[in-house]
UniProtKB/Swiss-Prot annotation:
Superkingdom of origin: Viruses
Protein location: Host membrane
Protein name, UniProt field: Ribonucleoside-diphosphate reductase small subunit
Organism: Saimiriine herpesvirus 2 (strain 11) (SaHV-2)
Active site: Y101
GO BP field: deoxyribonucleotide biosynthetic process; DNA replication
Signal peptide range: none
Classification lineage: Viruses, Duplodnaviria, Heunggongvirae, Peploviricota, Herviviricetes
Residues binding Fe cation 1: E64, E94, H97
Family as reported in the entry's similarity comment: Belongs to the ribonucleoside diphosphate reductase small chain family.
Length: 305
């Protein structure tokens, strides 16, 4: 009987079944992100801006693969059809994100793939990126149980890309890079769902007795916010419209929201900045379907940003 249950699908987690359905309804593809109109915008970027966004998109492009490696490691600890099905869908979406980032990099580097690879090798030695990776690797090494590993995964999904999304969203404020802005909408919304899934995994698949203390969790969140802030601050000063103090405020507000999603009190009491560019991704937009695809999710999601 157990062997039959292993291979024959039956619903064993309603929450993850619903998340899987949400993913099915909102699947999108790289072909839906037109970048032709963005090509002329590349020359509008000054040298400082271009270097900043080359760095961000190279980091994001490589990070997608790392996320999938983490998912594979995490899944080995669960025996659930619905959890496996959902994360198979998430891994597929991460691959789509990686393809879109590759398309954007090809545009920024004028289709010189050799230069893209060389640049990617160079930034692996960047001090800001190294500090971020050292913190994460150290915490992963120290994680002694399932609950701690899920919390780290939750922070990666919810904190470690958000300052990049914020900075990319500023293109819309400048009125340039419409294709990149659409991609950022899609990807930021996917990450909303992924963060909700990680919180659901923690809330439903760990026992209270297995979870670390609140003090441990708060310390982890404070460290993650500070590491992510230092990362974007090291690269973002002097970039057009990038206000690192607003990004810190947004990181704190995001950390508070994630804490509440796992039934803990907020620690910062911060709200997103009034002019947060990611507000566009959570508001209802009037879409002209002759101009571009609709990036609004069909279902109702709690704003994870």
């Amino acid at each position: 009987m157990d062997s039959v249950k292993k291979y024959l699908y039956t619903c064993d987690h309603v929450g993850f079944l619903e998340l899987t359905k949400e993913t099915w309804k909102n699947r999108w593809f790289p072909s839906q992100v037109p970048l032709q109109g963005d090509v002329c915008c590349v020359d509008m970027l000054n040298e400082r801006d271009l270097e900043f966004y080359k760095f961000l998109f190279t980091f994001l492009g490589m990070a997608e693969k790392l996320v999938n490696i983490n998912i594979e490691d995490l899944l080995s600890q669960f025996d659930s059809h619905d959890i496996s099905h959902y994360y198979a869908e998430q891994m597929a979406m991460e691959n789509i994100h990686g393809k879109v980032y590759a398309n954007i990099l090809n545009m920024l580097f004028k289709n010189n793939i050799t230069e893209v690879y060389s640049y990617a090798c160079d930034i692996m030695n960047d001090s800001a990126l190294q500090e971020k990776l050292r913190w994460l690797n150290g915490r992963v090494t120290e994680a002694s149980d399932k609950a701690e590993k899920i919390l780290l995964f939750l922070l990666v999904e919810g904190i470690f890309f958000i300052s990049s999304f914020f900075s990319i969203g500023l293109f819309r404020v400048r009125g340039i890079m419409n294709g990149i802005c659409l991609a950022n909408d899609y990807i930021a919304r996917d990450e909303m769902l992924h963060t909700s899934a990680a919180a659901l995994l923690y809330n439903t698949m760990t026992k209270s007795s297995e979870r670390p203390s609140e003090d441990w969790i708060y310390k982890l969140f404070r460290e993650a916010v500070e590491v992510e802030f230092k990362f974007i601050a090291a690269k973002g000063y002097g970039v057009s419209l990038v206000n690192v103090h607003e990004i810190r405020q947004f990181l704190q507000a995001t950390a508070d929201r994630i804490l509440e999603s796992i039934n803990l009190n907020p620690i910062y009491g911060s709200l997103p900045p009034e002019n947060c560019p990611l507000a566009y991704t959570s508001s209802t937009k009037s879409v002209n379907f002759f101009e571009r695809d609709n990036s609004d999710y069909t279902g109702t999601l709690t704003n994870d940003l």
